[in-house]
Amino acid sequence: SSVFHPNNESFCCSLFEHQTAMRKNRPFSRLKDFVVIPEFWALPFAEKCLEQNCGYAIFVQNGYLLNHGVSPEDYERLKKVYNRANLILSISDDTTEIIRIAYPYIEPQRIIRVTPTIAEGFVSSKKEKIISYMPRKLAEHSQKLCFYLKENLPNNWKLLPIENLSEQQVAQTLGHSSIFLSFSDQEGFALPPLEAALSGALVIGYTGQGAKEYFNSPNFIEIQN
């Protein structure tokens, strides 16, 4: 298998370590290739697969992005590429429900639930009095909550934003955090809350809908958004 970036053939993801082979040429072979397309690129690139008579799957990592960047007049084209897909890969139970609502004619056996992988580095370390959160998630909500919490926290507790960090640094921060505030919003699965819980933190906040399937006590406390 290999990864092909249609807009940048020299692209190589640097957000995490990997040894993935990168493909630098097209078109695809009807006999040799099977293409997996993320949902936000489904319309333009699934259509190209149809033109080349090449098998493909659409990987829906966030059901709330099914029509992202697609104008209403192109919804029938989008419907066609989902209808003609060999498989639809779904990241969560919530995402599967959304797919079935949007495209009820798709046979259930063509929708395959996949399970995300969590990096091995997300483990509990020596806990400190740290409440961590990711400010890029619902920034206005996190800013307001931090404002109200600031004067009410004991002096030996601190609020720590997680931003502009490598995966390893995020894992280290979560490992030392006692509490993680979740501001997930319209998420396909929402990995950060799960990573925080696996790192031994108590997770408090929003499920973003996608995390509902694992947001259970005693590791999680759900707050309605």
Residue positions per predicted region:
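Extended catalytic core of nucleotide-activated donor transferases of GT-like folds
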Residues: F4-R84
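Aromatic "clamp/platform" in nucleotide-sugar-dependent glycosyltransferases that forms part
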Residues: D185
